[in-house]
Amino acid sequence: VLDSEKSGLNKSPITVISGQGKTIFEAARSMNKKTSKVFFLADIDYVFLDQSVLTDGLDEIMDFLVRDTRLSLNFLIITSTENKSIDILSSISHFDTNSANNLYDAIMNSETRYGGINSLHVRELINNYYEKGKDTIFPNVYIKDTTKSSENNSLEDSKSESNVEVKNMVFFKDKEVIELTDEETKGVNFLRNKIKNATLTIKCDGGYFTIETLESKMKLISKLDVDTIN
């Protein structure tokens, strides 16, 4: 929530509001006790899912996303294997004091200018979840300097000067967290035709050289050789 009365280097213009409840909807509505502003689900830019939520299962989350017709279903899904969502949202970037905007822009910029990261929209998460044999990889972010995060005990003020950065991509298999390297993520993105712009560094005599891929199209053909089946 933007607070116009806060200004200066020591005060964040962002107030982080949290809520609790037995259900997702109850938790969301409970935040109205802490602010006069009205929250609209259609305004969501991204949903941050803690690692504990992803390892325990997505059944309740998916039920809420599919049933609620007020959601735009165009927002991003993000996670972190190192930090809690409240700490991520309470961190101020040197580039943008609005931590929500900074995190969204960092994901999109990494996807379109680097290639080692790709965004995950909620529609893709829903489709992958209900398709057998298909795992979902999530953008993984972290707080670069954790010693400066959450300087106060109150969740209501965002005062940390830590910088949130995009780390890598992860997926969850049988409650196990598997992190992909930049090269592994780029390989997956090439196979899935999700490369929009990527840099590839190749070793050569006397050093390395980097090439930029502006467009890529991959076609997979599977073949079953019955003669090799025992």
PLM feature segments, named:
Residues 1-230:
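Membrane-proximal alpha-helical signals and transmembrane carboxylates
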